[in-house]
């Protein structure tokens, strides 16, 4: 059984956006975002096939059994779109899996480039794609940080403190994509604090409570708000599309090398690759069960 509490001190979580809405077209058949098919045509921006692959980074080699954010599964997404470019001109991609109609969930796999445990959830979602809802998966919002093994993007911006100014191209891309697909729920993945938070609505609170129960935790936190000048990603997303609901999943880390530059390491939770893999599997299964109720 879980109770709701204010968010504990954060290691950090944010995002950034580029004006990309004009580069992806979406057929609108209803005013209800849930019933609108997601974009199934690629961005009109010309990209090479190699830009649709997440670059190898620190997370690929952190420890035995660790992995990066590239697709290791034999499964292929329904579509892949480029939602923008990073500060270092790397493509930021979004993969669509599962249903094209009905509930749509947006999962942001990595925001800080030195947080590697979220790759296990990304891998789990690809290995066992959803059957009863649509999934938009952004493997990493911060390909520069992933490549460099840094918390920030190529210009030193912490994307999860960019919710107000939305100055980074990565944040701009995410916000434009949020406007475009209007997800029913957004899931942000982080490490290494090992807790669950929710923001802005009954669906998010319900899914958060189910995750807390399934993971054997005691408390569901509210994700909280930073002062406007350092607004979190979910605050920026809510400003772009009012009423957007989100879940923050802070995973335990797979290594003490993970998130070395985090603002506050006093609450770090260290685990093993095996246990983080189980955590990721539970996240995938809980999302699947929760979204069945929205069909």
What are the residue ranges of the model-derived segments?
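Bacterial signal peptide processing site
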Residues: 4-7
């Amino acid at each position: 059984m879980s109770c709701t509490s204010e968010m504990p001190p954060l290691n950090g979580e944010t995002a950034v956006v580029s004006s990309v809405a004009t580069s992806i077209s979406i057929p609108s058949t209803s005013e209800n975002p849930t019933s609108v098919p997601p974009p199934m045509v690629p961005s009109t921006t010309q990209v090479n096939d190699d830009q649709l692959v997440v670059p190898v980074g620190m997370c690929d080699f952190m420890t035995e059994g660790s992995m990066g954010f590239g697709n290791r599964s034999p499964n292929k997404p329904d579509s892949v779109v480029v939602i923008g470019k990073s500060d270092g001109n790397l493509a930021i991609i979004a993969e669509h899996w599962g249903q094209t109609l009905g509930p749509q969930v947006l999962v942001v796999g990595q925001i800080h480039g030195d947080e590697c445990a979220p790759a296990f959830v990304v891998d789990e979602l690809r290995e066992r794609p959803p059957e009863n809802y649509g999934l938009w998966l952004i493997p990493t919002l911060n390909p520069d940080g992933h490549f460099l093994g840094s918390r920030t993007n190529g210009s030193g911006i912490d994307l999860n403190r960019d919710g107000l100014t939305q100055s980074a191209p990565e944040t701009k891309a995410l916000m434009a994509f949020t406007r475009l697909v209007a997800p029913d729920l957004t899931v942000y993945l982080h490490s290494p604090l090992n807790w669950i938070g929710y923001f802005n609505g009954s669906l998010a609170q319900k899914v958060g409570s189910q995750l807390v129960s399934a993971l054997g935790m005691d408390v569901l936190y509210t994700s909280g708000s930073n002062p406007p000048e350092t607004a979190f990603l979910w605050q920026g997303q809510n400003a772009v599309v009012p009423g957007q609901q989100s879940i923050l999943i802070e995973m335990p880390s797979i290594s003490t090398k993970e998130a070395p530059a985090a603002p506050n390491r006093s609450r770090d939770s260290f685990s093993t690759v095996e246990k983080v893999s189980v955590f990721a599997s539970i996240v995938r299964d809980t999302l699947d069960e929760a979204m069945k109720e929205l069909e």
